[in-house]
Structures are given as C-alpha cells and as structure tokens.
Amino acid sequence: MKDKDKAPFKFFTDIQKYVADVFREYGWYYTPGKVNLTEMWAIINKRGNFNTEHIHPNSNLSAAYYVKAPDNCGEFKVSNPHAISRDKFPERENPTELNRLIAKHKIEEGDLLIFPSYLPHSVLPNESDEDRMVVSFNLWIGR
C-alpha cells in the first residue's frame, strides 16, 4: 500500500503501534517495511446478523476494528485451531488455558482485535437494534 492519500494507508499508519505490540507479544521480529496490508473490507451486521466460523488463508495476521459496537451486539469467538482434535478432547475436570476449546470476547466500540489468520473465528449474532460496524483487514509479513 503506497498511496499515502488513501484512507487504508492512513488507517494502517495509525495502527502500526498496535501491530508492533502484537509482534512483540508473539516474540516475532518487527520490521515496519516488511508488514503489508493486503486486504481491507467493512462489514455491517444488522440485528440477527452474524459471521460464520472461518479462517483467512494467504495472510499471517488478521484484524477487526469495531467502529460501532452497541450493547448486546455479539461476541467475537475464537476456536481451538486443532480442528481434528476439537471433538476428541477428553472431558475436562478443570478448564484451563491449555485445554480451552473456545475463547470469547465481548465486543466494544473501539476494539482492535489482531490475531493469527489461521485461528478459526466467528462473530455471534447482533442482538442489538443498532448496526454493528467493523473494518477488517489482513496482513502479510514479508521476509
């Protein structure tokens, strides 16, 4: 993304600090010129709308920035990426971070969620009478 007058470029420039923080958390080397915004799109979910579970192939990191997130607009859900094992885990005596099957995040306006693109994720139904609005994007890390 080279056109500095385009909104996606300005948006990506503004969030670089957060992308760098994610790299540090994962223990990855961060080189600003090597992280590329490859795709960007917006989703408007009306009452009852949801996003089914999916992954983002051909990217390293994906993100969702919630522009509008009224109360009861749903939760962001991440599933265990070990798809083959999901139904084969033994019954849990104590739920822990190591045996968790899903993680949910209550969406709030202004949230920026950045996560590995291989993680299966979905967004639960919007139960609000107001629209839920999100700008999502994918990042590719050059070598």
What function would you assign to each model-found segment?
Residues 1-32, 50:
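Non-heme Fe(II)/2-oxoglutarate
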Residues 15-22, 101, 107-108, 121:
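Hydrophobic, well-ordered secondary-structure segments
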Residues 29-47:
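Hydrophobic beta-strand-centered segment that forms part of the acyl-chain substrate-binding groove
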Residues 36-40, 59-61, 131:
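A generic structural signal for short beta-strands and their flanking turns/coil linkers
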Residues 42-114, 141:
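Catalytic core of non-heme Fe(II) oxygenases with the double-stranded beta-helix
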Residues 51-54, 121-128:
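Short beta-strand His + acidic residue motifs that chelate non-heme Fe in jelly-roll/DSBH
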Residues 63-64, 129-143:
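A short hydrophobic beta-strand segment most commonly corresponding to one strand
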